């Protein structure tokens, strides 16, 4: 990450830099990936000035141009994996959930989506050698599903060698915000950026961003086909804001999604996730969870840029996610 201060950018003085930081643009990289209109509004400057600042930031941060495949390979060496600690599940997703990528988990009610994100909120705090990321968590809760009691049960269910502190310490590293509308949900990502920047040099920098659930508020507020276009535009921006966040902090993006039935499918599973192509194209990995016999859950890897489709079974127990 760049060590350049915002004040080093041409046209950005102390006052403008402070306004940018308050709006969530705490790094040169975040300025470089901003839109002209957003930056102009945040810093209260003209769009022409904002454009110059963005171009300068892109040059100083060395982003925005073409890179060779080898450059991309070198960058991918920074990627970490967050494990579920269920061997079959981890094998399915290539060793764990990748940082700098959004993993979407969708399924019907009771399929285990919120159980998975609670488990990841615990596992993220484990040291890397034990499958974690040694970091904290930002958790945007849109359905009032976060339960600290569940975190405690999962903490107690970790392997004996996994020591990350008492429950109070673990909960202190999970920063939860309840979203009440789609606009509030989008605003919370801006607040999350500020918080993550503040924690960047702490013992537990943010390494996991959770949105549970991604689409529920958008779906309830934008009902009917006539509102589909504005809903998708907002959802698209929201997803890309999350992408910028996880890229800037080398973190995992983990979102849950609701489903609907597709009556046009006569054979096979008619269940499909909400959000259409916007969510489908922005999420790097897509996991479909469903209930199975004997209390089992099945995770199916539906989409990945580098992994084959496949399935893994697991159990949701009081102690957390466990192998079958």
UniProtKB/Swiss-Prot annotation:
Pfam families linked to this entry: HHH_5 (PF14520), Rad51 (PF08423)
Keyword DNA damage in annotation: yes
Gene3D superfamilies to which the protein is assigned, alphabetical: 5' to 3' exonuclease, C-terminal subdomain, P-loop containing nucleotide triphosphate hydrolases
Residues in coiled coil: none
GO biological process, alphabetically ordered: DNA recombination; DNA repair
Domain of life, source organism: Archaea
Keywords: ATP-binding, DNA damage, DNA recombination, DNA-binding, Nucleotide-binding
GO MF, one example: ATP hydrolysis activity
Entry binding sites for ATP: 107-114
InterPro entries in UniProt: AAA+_ATPase, DNA_recomb/repair_Rad51_C, DNA_recomb/repair_RadA, DNA_recomb/repair_RecA-like, DNA_repair_Rad51/TF_NusA_a-hlx, Hlx-hairpin-Hlx_DNA-bd_motif, P-loop_NTPase, RecA_ATP-bd
SUPFAM superfamilies linked: P-loop containing nucleoside triphosphate hydrolases, Rad51 N-terminal domain-like
NCBIfam families named among the record's database cross-references: PRK04301.1, recomb_radA
Similarity field: Belongs to the eukaryotic RecA-like protein family.
Stated role: Involved in DNA repair and in homologous recombination. Binds and assemble on single-stranded DNA to form a nucleoprotein filament. Hydrolyzes ATP in a ssDNA-dependent manner and promotes DNA strand exchange between homologous DNA molecules.
Protein name per UniProt: DNA repair and recombination protein RadA
Source organism: Methanoculleus marisnigri (strain ATCC 35101 / DSM 1498 / JR1)
Organism classification: Archaea, Methanobacteriati, Methanobacteriota, Stenosarchaea group, Methanomicrobia
């Amino acid at each position: 990450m760049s060590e350049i201060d915002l004040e080093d950018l041409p046209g950005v003085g102390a006052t403008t830099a402070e306004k940018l930081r308050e709006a969530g643009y705490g790094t040169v990289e975040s300025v470089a990936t901003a839109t002209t209109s957003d930056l102009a509004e945040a810093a209260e400057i003209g769009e022409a000035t904002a454009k110059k600042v963005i171009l300068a930031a892109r040059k100083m941060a060395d982003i925005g141009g073409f890179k060779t495949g080898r450059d991309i390979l070198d960058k991918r060496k920074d990627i970490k994996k967050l494990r579920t600690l269920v061997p079959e599940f981890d094998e399915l997703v290539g060793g764990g959930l990748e940082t700098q990528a959004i993993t979407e988990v969708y399924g019907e009610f009771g399929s285990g989506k919120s159980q998975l994100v609670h488990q990841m909120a615990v596992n993220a705090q484990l040291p890397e050698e034990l499958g974690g990321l040694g970091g904290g968590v930002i958790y945007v809760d849109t359905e009032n599903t976060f339960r600290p009691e569940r975190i405690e049960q999962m903490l107690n269910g970790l392997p004996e060698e996994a020591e990350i502190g008492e429950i109070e310490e673990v909960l202190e590293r999970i920063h939860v915000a309840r979203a009440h509308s789609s606009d509030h949900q989008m605003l919370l990502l801006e607040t999350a950026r500020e918080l993550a920047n503040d924690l960047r040099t702490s013992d537990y920098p943010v390494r996991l961003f959770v949105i549970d659930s991604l689409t529920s508020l958008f779906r309830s507020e934008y009902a009917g086909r006539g509102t589909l276009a504005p809903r998708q535009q907002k959802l698209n921006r929201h997803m890309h804001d999350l992408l910028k966040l996880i890229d800037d902090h080398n973190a995992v993006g983990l979102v849950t999604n609701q489903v609907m039935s597709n009556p046009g499918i006569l054979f096979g599973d008619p269940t499909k996730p909400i959000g259409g192509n916007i969510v489908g194209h922005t999420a790097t990995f897509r996991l479909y969870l469903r209930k199975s016999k004997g209390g089992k859950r099945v995770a199916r890897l539906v989409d990945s840029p580098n992994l084959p489709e496949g399935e893994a079974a697991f159990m949701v127990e009081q102690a957390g996610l466990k192998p079958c």
